[in-house]
Protein backbone atom coordinates (compact mmCIF):
# COMPACT_ATOMS: atom_id res chain seq x y z
CA UNK A 1 0.00 0.00 0.00
CA UNK A 2 1.39 3.40 -0.96
CA UNK A 3 1.29 6.51 1.16
CA UNK A 4 0.34 9.94 -0.09
CA UNK A 5 2.93 12.34 -1.49
CA UNK A 6 2.47 14.62 1.48
CA UNK A 7 3.06 11.87 4.01
CA UNK A 8 5.76 9.79 2.36
CA UNK A 9 7.60 7.52 4.78
CA UNK A 10 11.15 8.53 5.78
CA UNK A 11 13.73 7.00 3.48
CA UNK A 12 11.23 6.19 0.74
CA UNK A 13 11.61 8.09 -2.51
CA UNK A 14 8.32 9.41 -3.90
CA UNK A 15 8.31 8.68 -7.64
CA UNK A 16 6.12 10.25 -10.32
CA UNK A 17 6.16 8.21 -13.54
CA UNK A 18 5.50 9.91 -16.88
CA UNK A 19 4.96 7.41 -19.67
CA UNK A 20 3.98 4.62 -17.30
CA UNK A 21 2.50 2.32 -19.97
CA UNK A 22 5.60 2.31 -22.18
CA UNK A 23 8.61 0.00 -22.01
CA UNK A 24 10.59 2.15 -19.54
CA UNK A 25 7.54 2.99 -17.44
CA UNK A 26 6.40 -0.61 -17.00
CA UNK A 27 9.91 -1.74 -16.06
CA UNK A 28 10.21 1.15 -13.60
CA UNK A 29 7.03 -0.01 -11.89
CA UNK A 30 8.53 -3.49 -11.60
CA UNK A 31 11.69 -2.05 -10.01
CA UNK A 32 9.58 -0.05 -7.55
CA UNK A 33 7.36 -3.03 -6.71
CA UNK A 34 10.48 -5.08 -5.95
CA UNK A 35 11.80 -2.37 -3.60
CA UNK A 36 8.85 -1.15 -1.51
CA UNK A 37 11.20 -0.06 1.26
CA UNK A 38 12.97 2.32 -1.15
CA UNK A 39 10.25 3.75 -3.39
CA UNK A 40 6.57 4.61 -3.59
CA UNK A 41 4.57 5.71 -6.65
CA UNK A 42 2.74 9.02 -6.22
CA UNK A 43 1.44 9.60 -9.75
CA UNK A 44 1.13 8.11 -13.23
CA UNK A 45 0.90 9.72 -16.66
CA UNK A 46 0.50 8.33 -20.16
CA UNK A 47 -0.34 9.50 -23.64
CA UNK A 48 -3.37 7.25 -23.81
CA UNK A 49 -2.39 4.50 -26.21
CA UNK A 50 -3.10 1.75 -23.68
CA UNK A 51 -5.89 2.87 -21.33
CA UNK A 52 -6.50 -0.67 -20.05
CA UNK A 53 -2.93 -0.99 -18.82
CA UNK A 54 -3.02 2.47 -17.23
CA UNK A 55 -6.20 1.55 -15.36
CA UNK A 56 -4.53 -1.64 -14.14
CA UNK A 57 -1.45 0.31 -13.01
CA UNK A 58 -3.61 2.75 -11.08
CA UNK A 59 -5.35 -0.12 -9.33
CA UNK A 60 -2.03 -1.81 -8.55
CA UNK A 61 -0.34 1.30 -7.14
CA UNK A 62 -3.40 2.86 -5.52
CA UNK A 63 -2.55 6.36 -6.76
CA UNK A 64 -5.22 8.98 -7.40
CA UNK A 65 -3.01 11.40 -9.34
CA UNK A 66 -3.30 10.21 -12.94
CA UNK A 67 -2.90 12.17 -16.18
CA UNK A 68 -3.83 11.16 -19.73
CA UNK A 69 -2.99 13.36 -22.71
CA UNK A 70 -5.71 11.89 -24.95
CA UNK A 71 -9.16 12.94 -23.64
CA UNK A 72 -10.87 9.93 -25.25
CA UNK A 73 -8.43 7.58 -23.55
CA UNK A 74 -8.99 9.42 -20.28
CA UNK A 75 -12.69 8.60 -20.54
CA UNK A 76 -11.82 4.95 -21.13
CA UNK A 77 -9.64 4.90 -18.00
CA UNK A 78 -12.33 6.67 -15.99
CA UNK A 79 -12.09 9.10 -13.07
CA UNK A 80 -8.88 10.69 -14.35
CA UNK A 81 -7.80 13.82 -12.52
CA UNK A 82 -5.95 15.39 -15.46
CA UNK A 83 -6.70 15.05 -19.18
CA UNK A 84 -5.85 16.94 -22.35
CA UNK A 85 -2.68 18.26 -24.01
CA UNK A 86 -1.34 19.92 -20.84
CA UNK A 87 -2.46 17.16 -18.47
CA UNK A 88 1.00 15.73 -17.85
CA UNK A 89 2.53 19.12 -17.12
CA UNK A 90 -0.27 19.97 -14.66
CA UNK A 91 0.23 16.63 -12.92
CA UNK A 92 3.94 17.37 -12.48
CA UNK A 93 3.24 20.85 -11.12
CA UNK A 94 0.65 19.61 -8.61
CA UNK A 95 2.34 16.43 -7.33
CA UNK A 96 5.01 16.41 -4.61
CA UNK A 97 7.71 13.98 -5.67
CA UNK A 98 11.36 13.30 -4.93
CA UNK A 99 11.94 11.79 -8.37
CA UNK A 100 10.15 12.43 -11.66
CA UNK A 101 10.81 9.72 -14.24
CA UNK A 102 10.16 11.18 -17.69
CA UNK A 103 9.71 8.16 -19.95
CA UNK A 104 7.42 9.88 -22.45
CA UNK A 105 8.21 9.32 -26.12
CA UNK A 106 9.11 12.21 -28.41
CA UNK A 107 9.42 15.97 -28.16
CA UNK A 108 6.12 16.26 -26.25
CA UNK A 109 8.21 15.51 -23.17
CA UNK A 110 9.81 18.97 -23.18
CA UNK A 111 7.20 20.86 -21.15
CA UNK A 112 6.94 18.12 -18.48
CA UNK A 113 10.75 18.07 -18.26
CA UNK A 114 10.88 21.81 -17.60
CA UNK A 115 8.00 21.54 -15.12
CA UNK A 116 9.77 18.73 -13.25
CA UNK A 117 12.99 20.74 -13.00
CA UNK A 118 11.03 23.71 -11.65
CA UNK A 119 9.73 21.60 -8.76
CA UNK A 120 13.26 20.81 -7.60
CA UNK A 121 12.73 17.05 -7.89
CA UNK A 122 15.44 14.85 -9.31
CA UNK A 123 14.67 14.23 -13.00
CA UNK A 124 15.32 10.66 -14.12
CA UNK A 125 15.38 11.38 -17.83
CA UNK A 126 14.56 8.68 -20.36
CA UNK A 127 12.89 11.15 -22.74
CA UNK A 128 16.07 12.13 -24.55
CA UNK A 129 14.09 14.10 -27.13
CA UNK A 130 13.18 16.81 -24.60
CA UNK A 131 16.86 17.42 -23.85
CA UNK A 132 17.80 17.27 -27.52
CA UNK A 133 15.01 19.66 -28.52
CA UNK A 134 15.21 22.11 -25.64
CA UNK A 135 18.90 21.75 -24.78
CA UNK A 136 19.84 25.30 -23.67
CA UNK A 137 16.49 25.85 -21.95
CA UNK A 138 16.66 22.52 -20.11
CA UNK A 139 20.25 23.08 -18.98
CA UNK A 140 19.40 26.58 -17.77
CA UNK A 141 16.45 25.23 -15.76
CA UNK A 142 18.41 22.39 -14.14
CA UNK A 143 20.38 22.64 -10.93
CA UNK A 144 23.78 20.87 -10.89
CA UNK A 145 23.22 17.12 -10.69
CA UNK A 146 19.43 17.44 -10.92
CA UNK A 147 19.20 15.46 -14.19
CA UNK A 148 20.12 11.77 -13.98
CA UNK A 149 20.06 9.89 -17.30
CA UNK A 150 18.12 6.66 -17.74
CA UNK A 151 19.53 5.71 -21.15
CA UNK A 152 21.89 2.78 -20.64
CA UNK A 153 24.70 4.60 -22.46
CA UNK A 154 24.49 7.81 -20.44
CA UNK A 155 23.98 5.91 -17.21
CA UNK A 156 27.20 4.09 -18.09
CA UNK A 157 28.97 7.40 -18.72
CA UNK A 158 27.84 8.80 -15.39
CA UNK A 159 29.24 5.73 -13.66
CA UNK A 160 32.53 5.83 -15.58
CA UNK A 161 32.99 9.52 -14.84
CA UNK A 162 33.01 8.73 -11.13
CA UNK A 163 36.50 7.38 -11.82
CA UNK A 164 38.12 10.70 -12.66
CA UNK A 165 37.68 14.46 -12.72
CA UNK A 166 36.29 16.38 -15.67
CA UNK A 167 39.74 17.87 -16.27
CA UNK A 168 41.18 14.34 -16.54
CA UNK A 169 38.65 13.24 -19.18
CA UNK A 170 40.02 12.88 -22.70
CA UNK A 171 37.04 11.47 -24.57
CA UNK A 172 33.78 9.56 -24.30
CA UNK A 173 33.22 6.39 -26.31
CA UNK A 174 29.52 5.88 -27.05
CA UNK A 175 28.69 2.31 -28.03
CA UNK A 176 26.00 1.25 -30.51
CA UNK A 177 24.62 -2.22 -31.13
CA UNK A 178 24.49 -1.44 -34.84
CA UNK A 179 20.81 -2.34 -34.93
CA UNK A 180 19.17 -5.17 -36.88
CA UNK A 181 20.83 -4.18 -40.17
CA UNK A 182 24.47 -4.22 -39.14
CA UNK A 183 26.55 -5.17 -42.18
CA UNK A 184 23.81 -4.41 -44.69
CA UNK A 185 24.64 -2.32 -47.75
CA UNK A 186 22.85 0.85 -48.77
CA UNK A 187 21.20 -1.14 -51.55
CA UNK A 188 20.02 -3.80 -49.06
CA UNK A 189 18.38 -1.15 -46.87
CA UNK A 190 16.03 -0.11 -49.68
CA UNK A 191 14.01 -3.28 -49.15
CA UNK A 192 13.62 -3.00 -45.35
CA UNK A 193 10.04 -3.31 -44.09
CA UNK A 194 8.54 -1.78 -40.93
CA UNK A 195 8.26 -5.29 -39.48
CA UNK A 196 11.99 -5.92 -39.97
CA UNK A 197 12.88 -2.52 -38.51
CA UNK A 198 10.77 -3.28 -35.44
CA UNK A 199 12.97 -6.16 -34.27
CA UNK A 200 16.06 -5.25 -32.27
CA UNK A 201 18.77 -7.92 -31.85
CA UNK A 202 19.64 -7.23 -28.19
CA UNK A 203 17.25 -4.74 -26.57
CA UNK A 204 13.53 -4.77 -25.77
CA UNK A 205 12.25 -1.25 -26.42
CA UNK A 206 9.19 0.64 -27.56
CA UNK A 207 8.42 0.81 -31.31
CA UNK A 208 9.78 4.33 -31.91
CA UNK A 209 13.05 3.69 -30.09
CA UNK A 210 13.43 0.39 -31.94
CA UNK A 211 13.01 2.09 -35.32
CA UNK A 212 15.39 4.88 -34.28
CA UNK A 213 17.94 2.23 -33.35
CA UNK A 214 17.58 0.63 -36.77
CA UNK A 215 18.27 3.94 -38.55
CA UNK A 216 20.95 4.92 -35.97
CA UNK A 217 19.02 8.15 -35.32
CA UNK A 218 18.81 6.96 -31.72
CA UNK A 219 22.59 7.04 -31.55
CA UNK A 220 22.55 10.52 -33.07
CA UNK A 221 20.18 11.68 -30.34
CA UNK A 222 22.43 10.06 -27.74
CA UNK A 223 25.46 11.85 -29.20
CA UNK A 224 23.70 15.19 -28.71
CA UNK A 225 22.55 14.15 -25.25
CA UNK A 226 26.13 13.23 -24.28
CA UNK A 227 27.35 16.69 -25.22
CA UNK A 228 24.56 18.39 -23.29
CA UNK A 229 24.67 16.22 -20.16
CA UNK A 230 28.41 16.04 -19.68
CA UNK A 231 29.72 19.13 -21.49
CA UNK A 232 31.98 17.09 -23.77
CA UNK A 233 32.87 18.60 -27.15
CA UNK A 234 31.37 16.80 -30.13
CA UNK A 235 34.86 16.07 -31.47
CA UNK A 236 35.67 14.27 -28.21
CA UNK A 237 32.76 11.83 -28.50
CA UNK A 238 33.48 8.69 -30.51
CA UNK A 239 30.77 6.27 -31.64
CA UNK A 240 31.71 2.60 -32.09
CA UNK A 241 29.61 -0.45 -32.90
CA UNK A 242 29.47 -3.12 -30.20
CA UNK A 243 26.99 -5.79 -31.36
CA UNK A 244 26.80 -7.63 -28.03
CA UNK A 245 25.46 -4.57 -26.14
CA UNK A 246 27.42 -5.53 -23.02
CA UNK A 247 29.71 -2.49 -22.77
CA UNK A 248 27.33 0.44 -22.64
CA UNK A 249 29.87 3.26 -22.88
CA UNK A 250 33.45 4.10 -21.96
CA UNK A 251 35.46 7.05 -20.72
CA UNK A 252 39.09 7.52 -21.71
CA UNK A 253 41.23 9.68 -19.45
CA UNK A 254 44.33 11.75 -20.13
CA UNK A 255 46.68 9.17 -18.58
CA UNK A 256 45.61 6.54 -21.12
CA UNK A 257 43.17 4.71 -18.84
CA UNK A 258 39.77 3.68 -20.19
CA UNK A 259 36.92 2.84 -17.82
CA UNK A 260 33.96 0.88 -19.19
CA UNK A 261 30.59 -0.04 -17.69
CA UNK A 262 29.51 -3.55 -18.63
CA UNK A 263 26.33 -5.49 -17.91
CA UNK A 264 23.91 -7.70 -19.84
CA UNK A 265 21.34 -5.65 -21.78
CA UNK A 266 18.62 -4.98 -19.21
CA UNK A 267 17.05 -1.54 -18.79
CA UNK A 268 16.12 -2.26 -15.19
CA UNK A 269 19.72 -1.55 -14.16
CA UNK A 270 19.89 2.08 -15.41
CA UNK A 271 16.27 2.65 -14.36
CA UNK A 272 17.01 1.51 -10.80
CA UNK A 273 20.21 3.54 -10.64
CA UNK A 274 18.41 6.69 -11.81
CA UNK A 275 15.63 6.20 -9.26
CA UNK A 276 18.06 5.60 -6.41
CA UNK A 277 20.93 7.86 -7.54
CA UNK A 278 23.63 8.05 -6.37
CA UNK A 279 22.98 4.75 -4.58
CA UNK A 280 22.76 1.40 -6.31
CA UNK A 281 19.76 -0.90 -5.91
CA UNK A 282 20.85 -4.42 -5.00
CA UNK A 283 19.58 -7.10 -7.36
CA UNK A 284 18.36 -4.64 -9.98
CA UNK A 285 19.64 -6.83 -12.82
CA UNK A 286 21.89 -9.79 -13.53
CA UNK A 287 25.65 -9.25 -13.73
CA UNK A 288 28.02 -10.46 -16.43
CA UNK A 289 29.07 -14.09 -16.06
CA UNK A 290 32.81 -14.15 -16.67
CA UNK A 291 33.07 -17.88 -15.95
CA UNK A 292 31.82 -18.65 -19.46
CA UNK A 293 33.62 -17.84 -22.69
CA UNK A 294 32.40 -14.78 -24.55
CA UNK A 295 33.56 -12.39 -27.24
CA UNK A 296 33.13 -8.63 -27.21
CA UNK A 297 33.50 -6.96 -30.60
CA UNK A 298 34.10 -3.28 -31.34
CA UNK A 299 33.69 -2.14 -34.94
CA UNK A 300 33.82 1.21 -36.74
CA UNK A 301 30.48 2.78 -37.62
CA UNK A 302 29.75 2.84 -41.36
CA UNK A 303 28.72 6.47 -41.68
CA UNK A 304 28.22 6.18 -45.43
CA UNK A 305 25.47 3.58 -45.02
CA UNK A 306 24.15 4.98 -41.72
CA UNK A 307 24.62 8.79 -41.89
CA UNK A 308 22.31 9.63 -38.96
CA UNK A 309 25.15 10.11 -36.46
CA UNK A 310 27.06 12.46 -38.77
CA UNK A 311 23.88 14.49 -39.26
CA UNK A 312 23.40 14.71 -35.49
CA UNK A 313 26.99 15.86 -35.05
CA UNK A 314 26.41 18.53 -37.72
CA UNK A 315 23.20 19.70 -36.03
CA UNK A 316 24.86 19.79 -32.62
CA UNK A 317 27.85 21.77 -33.80
CA UNK A 318 25.62 24.29 -35.56
CA UNK A 319 23.69 24.68 -32.33
CA UNK A 320 20.57 26.72 -31.75
CA UNK A 321 17.36 24.86 -32.55
CA UNK A 322 18.94 22.58 -35.16
CA UNK A 323 18.92 19.63 -32.78
CA UNK A 324 15.18 20.18 -32.32
CA UNK A 325 14.85 20.25 -36.11
CA UNK A 326 16.80 16.97 -36.35
CA UNK A 327 14.50 15.26 -33.89
CA UNK A 328 11.18 16.55 -35.24
CA UNK A 329 12.07 15.87 -38.86
CA UNK A 330 12.93 12.32 -37.86
CA UNK A 331 9.66 11.82 -35.97
CA UNK A 332 7.70 12.90 -39.05
CA UNK A 333 9.76 10.78 -41.45
CA UNK A 334 9.65 7.73 -39.19
CA UNK A 335 5.86 7.92 -39.05
CA UNK A 336 5.76 8.11 -42.85
CA UNK A 337 7.90 4.97 -43.12
CA UNK A 338 5.71 3.07 -40.68
CA UNK A 339 2.68 4.13 -42.74
CA UNK A 340 4.29 2.80 -45.92
CA UNK A 341 4.67 6.21 -47.57
CA UNK A 342 8.47 6.17 -47.89
CA UNK A 343 11.29 3.64 -47.82
CA UNK A 344 13.67 2.96 -44.95
CA UNK A 345 16.64 5.00 -46.30
CA UNK A 346 14.26 7.91 -46.93
CA UNK A 347 13.91 8.48 -43.17
CA UNK A 348 17.42 9.78 -42.65
CA UNK A 349 17.53 11.35 -46.13
CA UNK A 350 14.50 13.41 -45.13
CA UNK A 351 16.20 14.49 -41.91
CA UNK A 352 19.25 15.59 -43.91
CA UNK A 353 17.18 17.52 -46.45
CA UNK A 354 15.35 19.38 -43.69
CA UNK A 355 18.52 20.11 -41.71
CA UNK A 356 20.31 21.59 -44.68
CA UNK A 357 17.43 24.01 -45.24
CA UNK A 358 17.29 25.06 -41.58
CA UNK A 359 19.85 27.87 -41.36
CA UNK A 360 17.21 30.20 -39.91
CA UNK A 361 17.02 28.04 -36.78
CA UNK A 362 20.71 28.24 -35.85
CA UNK A 363 20.09 30.90 -33.18
CA UNK A 364 19.83 29.76 -29.56
CA UNK A 365 16.21 29.60 -28.36
CA UNK A 366 15.17 32.27 -25.87
CA UNK A 367 11.85 30.66 -24.96
CA UNK A 368 9.99 27.38 -25.26
CA UNK A 369 7.95 28.96 -28.06
CA UNK A 370 11.14 29.28 -30.12
CA UNK A 371 11.69 25.53 -29.81
CA UNK A 372 8.06 24.75 -30.61
CA UNK A 373 8.22 26.99 -33.69
CA UNK A 374 11.35 25.18 -34.89
CA UNK A 375 9.67 21.83 -34.35
CA UNK A 376 6.56 22.88 -36.27
CA UNK A 377 8.68 24.18 -39.14
CA UNK A 378 10.71 20.96 -39.23
CA UNK A 379 7.57 18.82 -39.34
CA UNK A 380 6.09 20.90 -42.16
CA UNK A 381 9.33 20.71 -44.13
CA UNK A 382 9.58 16.98 -43.53
CA UNK A 383 6.01 16.45 -44.71
CA UNK A 384 6.86 18.23 -47.95
CA UNK A 385 9.99 16.14 -48.47
CA UNK A 386 8.08 12.95 -47.67
CA UNK A 387 5.40 13.79 -50.22
CA UNK A 388 8.01 14.34 -52.92
CA UNK A 389 9.73 11.05 -52.13
CA UNK A 390 6.39 9.22 -52.04
CA UNK A 391 5.44 10.50 -55.47
CA UNK A 392 8.83 9.59 -56.95
CA UNK A 393 8.59 6.07 -55.55
CA UNK A 394 5.00 5.68 -56.72
CA UNK A 395 3.79 4.98 -53.18
CA UNK A 396 1.15 7.70 -53.39
CA UNK A 397 -0.39 9.68 -56.20
CA UNK A 398 -1.11 13.39 -56.30
Swiss-Prot record:
Binding residues for 1-deoxy-D-xylulose 5-phosphate: 128, 152-153, 177, 200, 213, 218-219, 222
EC number annotated for this UniProt entry: 1.1.1.267
Binding-site residues for NADPH, renumbered to this chain: 21-24, 47, 50, 127, 129, 206
Organism superkingdom: Bacteria
GO molecular function list: 1-deoxy-D-xylulose-5-phosphate reductoisomerase activity; manganese ion binding; NADPH binding
Enzyme class: oxidoreductase
Regions crossing the membrane: none
Record: residues binding Mn(2+): 151, 153, 222
Cofactor(s) required, per the database record: Mg(2+); Mn(2+)
InterPro entries: DXP_reductoisomerase, DXP_reductoisomerase_C, DXP_reductoisomerase_N, DXPR_C, DXPR_C_sf, NAD(P)-bd_dom_sf
Stated family: Belongs to the DXR family.
Name recorded for this polypeptide: 1-deoxy-D-xylulose 5-phosphate reductoisomerase
Upper classification of the organism: Bacteria, Bacillati, Actinomycetota, Actinomycetes, Mycobacteriales
